[in-house]
């Protein structure tokens, strides 16, 4: 009984310890912006799903570290897109009603976002 009480106390103590925030990972970023793929390849849009993903990403990337992680992920994703239309990619935030304090490009310095 005493061992069980100690185990319960340990679980409660661990549950009370604040966890470090997990940085935004590229798999998550990719899943959010994947609906934008046809538009950044020159198709019509951006779609409602694309805008929802961009808005969600913007809302989740609150800290500078999160913004830098998301930026680096987006650069990597963009480099892998065949027939990337950079003008369409740059137009997504304003067309989706997302105000970014920087311009999206393949050459963006993510340490400055």
Swiss-Prot record:
**UniProt record similarity statement:** Belongs to the plant LTP family.
Q: Which superkingdom heads the taxonomic lineage of this protein's source?
A: Eukaryota
Question: What molecular functions are annotated in GO for this chain?
Answer: lipid binding
Disulfide linkage: 26-73, 36-50, 51-96, 71-110
Q: List the Cis-14-hydroxy-10,13-dioxo-7-heptadecenoic acid aspartate ester lipid attachment residues.
A: 30
Identify the taxonomic lineage of the organism of origin. Eukaryota, Viridiplantae, Streptophyta, Embryophyta, Tracheophyta
UniProt cross-references to CDD domains, sorted A to Z: nsLTP1
Mind telling me which SUPFAM superfamilies this protein's record contains?
Bifunctional inhibitor/lipid-transfer protein/seed storage 2S albumin
One GO BP on record is: lipid transport
Q: What is this protein called?
A: Non-specific lipid-transfer protein
- What does the protein in this record do? Plant non-specific lipid-transfer proteins transfer phospholipids as well as galactolipids across membranes. May play a role in wax or cutin deposition in the cell walls of expanding epidermal cells and certain secretory tissues.
Q: Which residues form the signal peptide?
A: 1-24
- Cite the InterPro entries for this sequence: Bifun_inhib/LTP/seed_sf (IPR036312), Bifunc_inhib/LTP/seed_store (IPR016140), Plant_nsLTP (IPR000528)
Which positions are tagged coiled coil?
none
Query: Which UniProt key words apply to this protein?
Result: Disulfide bond, Lipid-binding, Lipoprotein, Signal, Transport
- Is Ribonucleoprotein set as a keyword in this record? no
């Amino acid at each position: 009984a005493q061992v069980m009480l100690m185990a319960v106390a340990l679980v409660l103590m661990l549950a009370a310890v604040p966890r470090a925030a997990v940085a935004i990972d590229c798999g998550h970023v990719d899943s959010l912006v994947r609906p934008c793929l046809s538009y950044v390849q020159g198709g019509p849009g951006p779609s409602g799903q694309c805008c929802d993903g961009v808005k969600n990403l913007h809302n989740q990337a609150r800290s500078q570290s999160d913004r830098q992680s998301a930026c680096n992920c987006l650069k990597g994703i963009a480099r892998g897109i065949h027939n990337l239309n950079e003008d369409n990619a740059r137009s997504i935030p304003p067309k989706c009603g997302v105000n970014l304090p920087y311009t999206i490009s393949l050459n963006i310095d993510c340490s400055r976002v």
